[in-house]
A protein has these predicted regions:
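C-terminal coupling/interaction segments
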Residues: 2-10, 19, 286-331
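ABC transporter nucleotide-binding domains
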Residues: 21-230, 236
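Solvent-exposed beta-strand sheet faces enriched in polar/charged residues
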Residues: 27, 254, 278, 309-311
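ABC transporter nucleotide-binding domain
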Residues: 195-285
């Protein structure tokens, strides 16, 4: 039984299909470490203005290194990058005040409170207005649900609280671009939902959000555009709806007890690929077969048909379809 393969050229592999103004752009961005390891390889990243761009990939795929290069924390080996039309790192000093960032493993003073840590960040920012610093710090802490712990020492914070403080630091002032590296790391399900809500709220207000994650299912719920990395290279990127539309649709047949095996034989006989039986349900790649033809064939074969559903693939299924690999989310 053959496996259907998604054509990468049709789904925006490499340079992607973004048109119009870009908030983030890289051309051939590459980072090779002294050890010889290539962490990012010839990356063409395209993040449209106003988008929520899910920058996805397994751990170790090059996402954090890319973000560090964009923010001037790591110097690229080759290639070029722009944030909000400004070349970086050449114009970083001018453009970074318009960019909020949460980079993996944010560092704060362990013996200062959350509120005092934000005050130190404000004092170090020459572009910040000291007259509104206290108010903005309070608003940022409230926005991330940390008001009750604002005066606790950072060293007493849990991992999730530390992550929330990092988010608060990125939100001290209105930003044109927000870069979030694994923002749900350490958060419980409620905290994860709050981050998704916050991202939507920021996008509705006109902020472009670049959010990296190894959790496809979480980011898929909020992003408008996606780019998926693997071993330092872009596997695909573009408008999320368009990517999903180009993926191979899957069919789920729900049978009455005792007829799932016969249903699987019928689907295989019709030429459907990746036929899998799970209890009374049978899943398969639909391919070019019409759902109505499947229904007729099942009924004729005496299969007890309780339901038939056609669904679009998830981003994880598209990744597997393109690469033949599972999306390893182990930390």
């Amino acid at each position: 039984m053959s496996t259907a393969v998604l054509d990468p050229a049709r789904v925006g592999q490499g340079s992607g299909d973004a048109t119009g103004p870009l908030a983030v752009r890289t051309d051939g961005l590459t980072k090779r470490f002294r050890s010889g390891q290539v962490a990012v390889d010839d990356l063409d990243l395209r993040v449209p203005r106003g988008a929520v761009y899910g920058f996805l990939g397994p751990n170790g795929s090059g996402k954090t290194t890319t973000i560090r290069m964009l923010l001037g924390l790591v110097r690229p080996t080759a290639g070029a990058a722009w944030l909000l039309d400004a070349p970086v790192p050449a114009a970083s000093a001018a453009v970074l005040p318009r960019v909020g960032a949460l980079v993996e493993g944010p560092a704060f003073h362990p013996y200062l409170s959350g509120r005092d840590n934000l005050a130190r960040l404000e004092a170090a920012d020459a572009t910040a207005d000291p007259r509104t610093a206290d108010r903005r710090a309070g608003e940022a802490l409230e926005r991330v649900g940390l008001s009750a712990a604002a005066d606790k020492r950072y060293r007493q914070y849990s991992l999730g609280m530390k992550q929330r403080l990092g988010l608060a630091a990125a939100l001290l002032r209105p930003r044109d671009l927000l870069v979030l590296d694994e923002p749900t790391n350490g958060l419980d399900p409620q905290g994860t939902r709050e981050v998704r809500h916050l991202v939507r709220e920021l996008a509705d207000a006109g902020t472009t959000v670049l959010v990296s994650s190894h959790l496809l299912a979480e980011i898929e719920q909020v992003c408008t555009h996606v780019g998926i990395m693997r071993t330092g290279r872009m596997v695909l990127q573009g408008d999320r709806s368009a990517l999903v539309a180009h993926g191979a649709a899957r069919l789920r047949v729900t049978t009455t007890a005792g007829t799932a095996g016969e249903a699987a034989r019928v689907l295989t006989g019709l030429g459907l690929d990746e036929v899998r039986v799970d209890g009374v349900q049978v899943d398969a790649l639909l391919g070019s077969v019409r759902p109505e033809d499947v229904s007729v064939a099942l009924v004729r074969a005496g299969v007890g048909l309780a339901g038939l559903e056609v669904r679009s693939p998830s981003l994880e299924e598209i990744f597997v379809e393109l690469t033949g690999e599972g999306f390893d989310v182990a930390r």
